[in-house]
Amino acid sequence: SLTGAVKNIPYRVSLGYLNENGILRTGNIERITGALNLNPRFFDNHLKIDASVKGSRINNRFANTDAIQTAVSFDPTQPVKADGFDKYDGYFTWLMPDGNLKTQALTNPMLLLNTYDNTSNVSRVIATAQIDYKMHFLPELRANLNVGYDYSKGKGKVYIPEWAPQMASR
């Protein structure tokens, strides 16, 4: 953060950044934030203005938590990837003798994590202003105005390839 004054107008600017991986391999959050505060005073402090703008952008990738239970129960002697599983991006997958998917079998937990793309992006801006004016002729009498604005926009998507075993049950 940075504080100071320009032509007797005090200000404070702050920026923030976070990029953190989740507990599961594909989970992640990236957050970018910024804020600006202005606090000018005029006419021997009879007019006070406090204004602020805060903004943020949050990008999330949510890991497939089904992979936790599957990892606990999945056969540990099977490889994560193996030859002959091109249809499943090389991930070992339980198949029937005819080569079709065993729909009741556990899905490879790494396949669950790496083929599940669940993301959200949220942008938000909050702006506020307070204007307070003490009347010169009667300083106990004040006019006060508070205004605010809050804007938020979000978008999310979930993508699972059609060939993924978790799509077979749909």
Cite the ranges covered by each PLM segment.
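Outer-envelope beta-barrel architecture signal
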Residues: 7-11, 45-49, 139-143
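Short strand-turn segments of transmembrane beta-barrel domains in outer membranes
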Residues: 1, 11, 15-27
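Surface-exposed loop/interface segments of Gram-negative outer-membrane beta-barrel transport/assembly proteins
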Residues: 1, 23-24, 33, 37-126, ...
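Residue-level signature of outer-membrane beta-barrel architecture
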Residues: 4-6, 36, 40-42, 131-135
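Ser/Thr- (and often Asn-) enriched beta-sheet segments in non-cytosolic proteins
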Residues: 132-134, 141-142, 153
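Acidic/polar N-terminal loop/beta-strand segments that form early-domain functional surfaces
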Residues: 5, 14-16, 134, 146-148, ...
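Alpha-helical scaffolds flanking conserved acidic
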Residues: 29-31
